[in-house]
């Protein structure tokens, strides 16, 4: 089994004038002026984490992400997602796998790789080819207030809470989701990732539709005992055979609460 590939990943370079970095996601097809920062390509080794599946270190708490296999869904057929049923199924899965008492899905994205196509329709987004974390801690708290009743938010925020993404291929075997293992229009806030040679990147090769990855995007436990979040990115696997169908995936983003 392959131990990894060498690939180009894209990292954020801060604005040269010291401004706070921003991106306008709904600015239309001309993306040249949608952000005030630049991207820096770096050639890195992306390790195949399938060779480490017996390692207890790759869990949500220790690494910030976790692969689950032999978990087929009945709500994706012929490339089409039955969203309502998939939501209900995913909530049940997340409660089972994390021990959470409450799970709230606040959005989803279906990504179908289409060269030359752009747009922010949640069913037509392209794979996100920049290293990033979906939510800062400030944005995580704002999500709780935005998506939960005002009377419920204080009690939920007083206990452990997280944002966790559930990422699953739709049809084709897919592996072009890079994960950084050692991770520390409404406006939102995300983390851009700068390159550091100490980073270690990995992926799960040839993921199937009966597999998914849980990706932690933020965490209320801030004492260093658990992983806070996982930077991630799409990337072009140079070993992909010519003519391979383009990647298709669905990612749901969830607020996860514990008693």
Model-derived regions, located:
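Basic/polar N-terminal segments that are highly enriched at the extreme N-terminus
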Residues: 1-6, 257-259
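Non-heme Fe(II) oxygenase catalytic core, chiefly the N-lobe of the double-stranded beta-helix
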Residues: 3-190, 198-200, 205
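Catalytic core of Fe(II)/2-oxoglutarate
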Residues: 189-259
